[in-house]
Amino acid sequence: MSDLEAPLRPKRKKIWVDYFVKFRWILVIFVVLPISFTLYFLTYLGDVRSEWKSFKTRQKEHDENVQKVVNRLKKRNPSKDGLVCTARKPWVAVGMRNVDYKRARHFEVDLSPFRNILDIDKERMIARVEPLVNMGQITRVTVPMNLALAVVAELDDLTVGGLINGYGIEGSSHKYGLFSDTVVAFEIILADGSLVKATKDNEYSDLFYAIPWSQGTLGLLVAAEVKLIPIKEYMKLTYKPVVGNLKDIAQAYSDSFAPRDGDQDNDEKVPDFVETMIYSPTRAVCMTGRYASKEEAKKKGNKINNVGWWYKTWFYQHAETALKKGLFVEYIPTREYYHRHTRCLYWEGKLILPFGDQFSFRFLFGWLMPPKVSLLKATQGEAIRNYYHEMHVIQDMLVPLYKVGDALEWSDREMEIYPIWLCPHKLFKLPIKTMIYPEAGFELQRRQGDTQNAQMFTDVGVYYAPGPVLRGEVFDGAEAVRKMESWMIENHCFQPQYAVSELNEKNFWRMFDAGLYEHCRRKYGAVGTFMSVYYKCKKGRKTEKEVREAEQAHLDTAYPEVDQPPD
């Protein structure tokens, strides 16, 4: 939307928080970045130390830590100790929610020791990992073996547990689905302290399908077995500029990975990686990647771009150059490609450090980047948090592929946020209805990208300050999110709950399906022990009444029954 087309809004009167946010870069440079670098280095040393340990030692430590969690759960007094949650501080999580449920009465269980890669099974092509293993840690181990998780979320600090209990996506999700779709087994400690292993075809198959998106409210995840795939040393990346309106961009994006003849499972026609970045209502760059060998990448005439070096142009800005120079192809080392958005936090780094993209800063201080999201959250008080909720948007909309154009037009009209990130993912038709699910009958009228067993969706990632805020105008962030959520419910979309949500409980369960989740809450004793997923996601501090009602929930509550997965 151009400035002439933008709706007239009154100017917003500046308050003291505006000036603090404007000059927050001082705190970031002199405090947050040095501490972040130190923490990254210490974490790296801990990871290396763990890798040196034998499988037997790591498994022994894992078993001991599991027993500690079991013992801790058994010490809980339901009448006075509160509902169970992890002992992680509210600011540690990468998500944008305030984790307000930890500001009320609760019973903490420490899962911090669960950060080891337990085994890489090359024969079964499975990685067995603990929940606090992060993406940077796992790729450092697997990529030298020419292996990788089927879905590697871009940011280094994202953990396996968060990607399973919450939400995780990457440019390969148009082939493999969301991160949780690549998990073959969950190891869960239930409310009674029992340790169970849930797979899609054992006695805990209902729990297996209910865990994703449950936010840790069915049990405590202590390990997971995740699919590995073979990879090559480089990613051959093609940058294709697109100029047109938002519907044109949406169609070009769809065409970049979804054959119009419906042959979606043909690897010859479908690239290994896909993403599109939209820089304005009329300009975008579609990127497609295919794994390539070292020999191919180093052939005469091919360009290799080591995007991981600290002084390199931030990736989203590098991709934007395609709009000036036209289509081009280059080869990026695979691990550097996986984490291409880490150093600049997509484009959020530009707001945190307005001059951070300048060559002089990148060359002198780029090695300190990125600031840890947890430290950014730890150094902001209540007023700053509320300011960001009102004046800044970090939201993902999971939208059916054929509705992406509509979603882009809605976002442009209501928020005016650019760049926008597009990343496709399969939403599988499972043997049992889960919290998120494809549209009924999609397989009978398959649209572009759909297959017989999966509907193609897209993550429309909206991360930045809205246009009205950048122009100094009045903007109601909470109301904008409420409108977004209403549009999503009407259009069979889903909102990842790492973000700030304005949904009330009724609308939350209009967006998500409660059947299997509530069935497993009752069956496995989570009610009255673990918080409900809405309780955890609800915005705002919990009142004493809300805490008491959640604690006193009992197992004879009327939950909807669901069909069990077929044997």
From Swiss-Prot:
Which residue spans traverse the membrane? 25-45
- Subcellular localization: Membrane
Enzyme Commission identifier(s): 1.3.1.72
Ranges where the FAD-binding PCMH-type domain occurs: 45-231
Q: What broad class describes the main subcellular location of this protein? A: membrane
Induction, per UniProt: Not induced by brassinolide.
**Chain residue ranges for the region called Disordered:** 548-567
**Organism domain of life:** Eukaryota
Q: Which GO terms describe its cellular component?
A: cytoplasm; membrane
The record's keywords, sorted A to Z, are: Calmodulin-binding, Membrane, NADP, Oxidoreductase, Signal-anchor, Transmembrane, Transmembrane helix
Give this protein's Gene Ontology molecular function annotations: calmodulin binding; Delta24-sterol reductase activity; FAD binding
List all topological domains (Cytoplasmic).
Answer: 46-567
Q: Which reaction does it catalyse?
A: lathosterol + NADP(+) = 5alpha-cholesta-7,24-dien-3beta-ol + NADPH + H(+)
GO process annotations (BP): steroid metabolic process
Residues in compartment: Lumenal: 1-24
- Matching InterPro entries, A to Z? Diminuto-like (IPR040165), FAD-bd_PCMH (IPR016166), FAD-bd_PCMH-like_sf (IPR036318), FAD-bd_PCMH_sub2 (IPR016169), Oxid_FAD_bind_N (IPR006094)
The segment annotated Interaction with calmodulin runs over 520-541
Tissues/organs with expression: Highly expressed in the apical region and root tips and lower levels in immature and mature internodes and leaves.
Q: Which Pfam families match?
A: FAD_binding_4 (PF01565)
List the membrane topology term(s).
Single-pass membrane protein
Protein family: Belongs to the DIMINUTO family.
Function comment:
Plays a critical role in the general process of plant cell elongation.
Instruction: Kindly provide the name given to this protein in its UniProt entry.
Output: Delta(24)-sterol reductase
